[in-house]
Regions:
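Glycine-rich, anion-gripping cofactor-binding loops and their flanking helix/strand elements
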Residues: 18-102
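Generic signal for short, ordered secondary-structure residues
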Residues: 9-10, 49-50, 90, 107-111
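Glycine-rich, N-terminal phosphate-binding loop of Rossmann-like dinucleotide-binding domains
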Residues: 14, 80-81, 124
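Cofactor-pocket helix-loop regions in the catalytic cores of large enzyme subunits
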Residues: 1-53, 143-170
């Protein structure tokens, strides 16, 4: 909890462990308490509301520019039920290089496997979040969130169709 309380630019990174653990409600409360942006992996889809303003899209090679820039600038990455796959981290030496990394996970094989973390809390993600939420007071990271929201405006995930796509032409 100390890492979380001292962070000025926290970022929450959600993976499949949060889905398997059915931790959506606890995750929602955690995000509100920490007042931080949220990114996820393909396996983490559904654990957090992908339509909310705090949500920045997926992370990594299949992710958004906002998520990738934000994680590169954060001072604390809170990894919840993630594997740190190569499609997410890219160059391990450059991944979240300005951040402490705090991992919540049930699988000891995932800890320090691809990314060395600063601290890990082992156990069921839902239970971890319940306990952490009980110990946190609401925080405010207004400037950090405004910075991330500016990225979302500057680099929106949009689609602009121009003419017929390949399948329609056939």
């Amino acid at each position: 909890v100390s890492y979380i309380r001292h962070a000025k630019k926290p970022y929450i990174f959600v993976g499949g462990g949060a889905v398997i653990s059915e931790a959506s409600e606890e995750l929602k409360e955690f995000v509100e308490l920490v007042d931080a942006p949220v990114t996820d992996t393909l396996m983490g889809k559904g654990a957090y509301d992908g339509t909310g303003e705090r949500y920045t899209g997926m992370l990594g090679m299949h992710g958004t520019k906002t998520s990738n820039l934000g994680v590169s600038e954060c001072d604390l990455l809170i990894a919840i039920g993630v594997r740190f796959s190569d499609r997410v981290i890219g160059n391990a030496k450059k991944f979240a290089r300005h951040a402490k990394i705090l991992q919540f996970d049930v699988d000891p094989a995932e800890v320090n496997k691809n990314i060395v973390v600063d601290a890990c809390v082992m156990g069921d993600v839902r239970e971890i979040l319940k306990k952490v939420n009980e110990r946190l007071e609401p925080m405010e990271h207004r400037e950090w969130m405004e910075h991330i929201l500016e990225y979302k405006k500057q680099y929106p995930l949009t689609y602009h169709p121009q003419g017929l796509s390949g399948p329609y032409m056939i």
